[in-house]
């Protein structure tokens, strides 16, 4: 898929080196097709890493995608240069009168706080309410999925005794749903979180369907209604070394952290981790764009 981004976005050069087709603004203007307009609300602290991961994940269909990065106005993180945010990001206030084919709400390192304690919670609520009328389909990731289930369905999150950290095996529960088309019966996905959402509470809501879950890691993929809202509790977009970076960061800080499960060969953190989840991650994003965005959205937004 040609991904349309600003010409000078640093992630563009990284992905071009991976032979991923990144289309500049000038060339995109001369294509006689309407690109899918996708907004990404990037709540992760290392925003440039997340940009690369998500753009890579969105690059596997022939559809042209026009990306708009969003950040919060009520909170500015310390891990991304202000100049980068000013150059490549907008806020909800900037786009509130626009319509998008799709929206991705990322995770955020705030899951051990109550939702109402998060500095930008009120702003996020406005964005999620706005998405009901201005976005064809919204994909919520990790904490973003917990926040979405809480806001739209009143489903709470609960603390885990130990961090869910590693690569876990999941079972497919509903093969007929297009979101998981092409998935194997059993597949792997990364998790990195301190809280969980109750399977029982999800099942009590007739509008929600669990599509995949793990005996160890719990629910992974939940679909709301006809796909207007999709919730993914893990991090399928993570690249090979993301969990490695998180683990070694916490070790260097002197924090108590266990090895990520099923990640390092022989549980040796000096060895290069195996990349065992990307095919299904790519299928997830491709299916979302194709079946829940492209085939549903009107030609004129």
Swiss-Prot record:
The keyword Signal does not apply. One of its GO terms (molecular function) is homoserine O-succinyltransferase activity. It catalyses: L-homoserine + acetyl-CoA = O-acetyl-L-homoserine + CoA. Its EC number is 2.3.1.31. One of its GO terms (cellular component) is cytoplasm. The record marks 192 as: Important for substrate specificity. HAMAP family: MetA_acyltransf. This is Homoserine O-acetyltransferase. The gene is metAA. It is found in: Cytoplasm. The keyword Heme does not apply. It comes from Lachnoclostridium phytofermentans (strain ATCC 700394 / DSM 18823 / ISDg).
